[in-house]
Amino acid sequence: GQTVVVKNMAVMAVEAIEGTDACILRGGKLGKDAVVAKTAKPAQDDRFDVPGVGTKTIQSMIESGCKALVIEAGHTLLTEREKVVALADEHGITIVAK
């Protein structure tokens, strides 16, 4: 998958080799209350590399001050869904599947 962190229509961070969590931490520190978007790469084969979101993703958002997560419905693996939603709710993080 691919992650980008944005605030007020400005890109704070784009995921590189360091991975999703490092991108979130870097971007969130540059723009508090930022939005994290996690999507599949163009022409990505869902059989081999599915974008994933879990409690570690939400923990990184909490640590960096990001306030919303946007994921691609039907193309993102949400592990431990109940725990992810509860943790996000507890910390005021909105999750949108589009």
Where in the sequence are the language-model features?
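Conserved mixed alpha/beta catalytic, RNA-binding, or beta-rich assembly cores of soluble enzyme
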Residues: 1-58
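C-terminal binding/interaction regions
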Residues: 59-98
